[in-house]
């Protein structure tokens, strides 16, 4: 049987919002398997989490830059928020975004790209030597359309084009570029607020959908629902799930009546003067998935995990 550590309890608690003892039991029942523990809690009705969302903070900045039909979003990490507020670091992030807009989203290519008499990697090394703190280009994403716009939005901007969260979204259209730009920014703000996982149900990971279906079915069985009704209930439940995680099916935050994003985009075609198709989006939140030491919390839950 796997040893249940304080860190494991902490991660499950952050992911589900469930109490420490229930998290410990869920991990024990599932031999320390985190995903199985999440599903176990959901089947018990203790967690309403639709997906694994335990994101640990890291420092640095998200940068986003667009130029008409193309755009990029990058994440550059530092060790402390103090450095993220440093003008040299901020300038570094803006420079890397400009390079990424030219060479694309491959991190290795960005690092190898020339900057003055050096490279991006060299510029990062110079900044490390000057500022005295480790930093790295963690990831990058790019979008491009043949006609239309790529729009961006930075949430909690520290400087123009960089902050704690960044979104780019691509709109394919032959319509008015200025109107597309306004719509694109509104959509980017929506994506920042709602964190969709895919454009539509077809874009979701089939394994995620399978797990969701299985969790729902098991939950209703435990509630005593008749077997011949469960499939229909689950299908209705999946429709609700899609409205939560698929961009085109989400309730548009800029519409008071809550019409779906897909319908809002369709309605905007008259103003734009041509059909509009959202071809993709990226949403980067600072520190997604990066482990960071939180020793105080670990000490707090050590007793619940049976450690000293």
UniProtKB/Swiss-Prot annotation:
PROSITE patterns reported in the protein's UniProt record: EF_TS_1, EF_TS_2
Region (Involved in Mg(2+) ion dislocation from EF-Tu): 80-83
CDD domains found in the cross-reference section: UBA_EF-Ts (cd14275)
Gene3D superfamilies noted in UniProt: 1.10.286.20, DNA helicase RuvA subunit, C-terminal domain, Elongation factor Ts, dimerisation domain
Cellular component GO terms, alphabetical: cytoplasm
Molecular-function annotations in GO: translation elongation factor activity
Subcellular location as annotated: Cytoplasm
Keywords from the named record: Cytoplasm, Elongation factor, Protein biosynthesis
Pfam family, one: EF_TS
Source organism, top-level taxon: Bacteria
Biological function: Associates with the EF-Tu.GDP complex and induces the exchange of GDP to GTP. It remains bound to the aminoacyl-tRNA.EF-Tu.GTP complex up to the GTP hydrolysis stage on the ribosome.
Family under the similarity heading: Belongs to the EF-Ts family.
Protein's recorded name: Elongation factor Ts
Species this protein is from: Rhodopseudomonas palustris (strain BisB5)
């Amino acid at each position: 049987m796997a040893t249940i550590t304080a860190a494991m309890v902490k991660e499950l608690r952050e992911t589900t919002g469930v109490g420490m003892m229930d998290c410990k039991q869920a991990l024990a029942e599932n031999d320390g398997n985190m995903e199985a523990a999440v599903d176990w809690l959901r089947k018990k009705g203790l967690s309403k989490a639709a997906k694994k969302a335990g994101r640990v903070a890291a420092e640095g900045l998200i940068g986003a830059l667009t130029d008409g039909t193309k755009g990029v979003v990058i994440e550059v990490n530092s060790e402390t928020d103090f450095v993220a507020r440093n003008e040299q670091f901020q300038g570094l992030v803006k420079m890397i975004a400009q390079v990424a807009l030219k060479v694309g989203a491959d991190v290795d290519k960005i690092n190898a790209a020339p900057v003055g008499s050096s490279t991006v990697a060299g510029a990062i090394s110079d900044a490390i030597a000057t500022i005295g703190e480790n930093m790295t280009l963690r990831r990058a994403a790019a979008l491009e359309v043949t006609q239309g716009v790529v729009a961006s939005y930075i949430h909690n901007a520290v400087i123009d084009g960089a902050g704690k969260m960044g979104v780019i979204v691509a709109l394919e259209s032959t319509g008015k570029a200025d109107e597309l730009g306004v719509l694109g920014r509104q959509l980017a703000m929506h994506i920042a607020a709602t964190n969709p996982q895919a454009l539509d149900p077809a874009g979701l990971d089939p394994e995620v959908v399978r797990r969701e279906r299985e969790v729902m079915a098991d939950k209703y069985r435990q509630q005593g629902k008749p077997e011949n009704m469960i499939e229909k209930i689950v299908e209705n439940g999946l429709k609700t799930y899609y409205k939560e995680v698929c961009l085109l099916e989400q309730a548009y935050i800029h519409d008071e009546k809550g019409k779906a994003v897909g319908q809002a985009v369709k309605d905007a075609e008259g103003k734009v003067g041509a059909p509009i198709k959202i071809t993709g989006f990226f949403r980067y939140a600072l520190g997604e998935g990066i482990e960071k030491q939180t020793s105080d919390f670990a000490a707090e839950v050590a007793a619940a995990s049976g450690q000293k």
